[in-house]
Amino acid sequence: MQRFFVEPHQIDEAAHQIHIIGTDVNHISNVLRMKQGEEVWISDGGQKEYRCAIEAFSADEVLLHIIYAQEPDYELPSRIYLFQGLPKADKMELIIQKAVELGAYEIIPVETKRCVVKLDGKKAAKKVERWQQIAESAAKQSKRMLIPNVHQVLSFKEALKYAESMDIRLIPYELAKGMQETKEILAAIEQGQSIGIFIGPEGGFEEKEVEAAISEGAKPITLGKRILRTETAGLAILSGLMFQLEN
């Protein structure tokens, strides 16, 4: 069943109706070619989802009838922020898609010293807009209750500042101590804590960047004896955290 997201003001629980507006109108009417009576899931971007039936179509709105509402437990009990060093080509699209599926709360693109890709101004804004669309599509597909935000591109220094208030900050590093210490660090993470994960681009972080992150409170961890690509590393950590934190 198709899933869509709405703002709270689009929901009229007293009248048992939800008003779909914006680009989803065209998607429902002309792309999916849905008909009156067909059912969809609607998320309010918070804790509630609604099973609805299509009641009527107009040029700028799809009117839904609420069949029932529920408060499912789809989201992870911790907010996970993925600080991803800008990779080459279209790898960021894959990273965002899979990070959303695995429960990331926000994805922050980061420009580090070894990044080949450099984004600024209109180019950066256009990329972030595209990435946000990918996050929304992945959220719909994976039954997320919210659409994870794709932040504007930050410098590494700005990223460290942004992560200051997070309870846990992790940075995979080839010189980190053994797997046992990494397991202990991950096992100590509790539900409800906010978690920042720093992933380098191709070529990894410069040593000075790792030192700066550690001085700001980040904990170096290992991802094992094998070398992981930048598009794999963050997803490996997210997978482990998902299994550990999932209710």
Task: Put a short name on every predicted segment.
Residues A124-V128, A188, S239-G240:
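Short, hinge-like loop/turn segments at secondary-structure boundaries
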Residues V40, H65, E71-F83, L186-Q193:
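Mobile, glycine- and charge-enriched loop segments
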Residues D73-I171:
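RNA substrate-binding interface of SAM-dependent RNA methyltransferases
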Residues E207-N247:
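Structured adenosyl-cofactor binding patch, chiefly the S-adenosyl-L-methionine
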Residues M166-G204, E209, A218-I221:
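Active-site/ligand-binding-proximal alpha/beta "capping" segment
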Residues M1-E71:
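N-terminal positively charged helical leader segments and presequences
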Residues H9, A69, E111-R114, K225-R226:
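Short, ordered loop/turn segments at secondary-structure junctions
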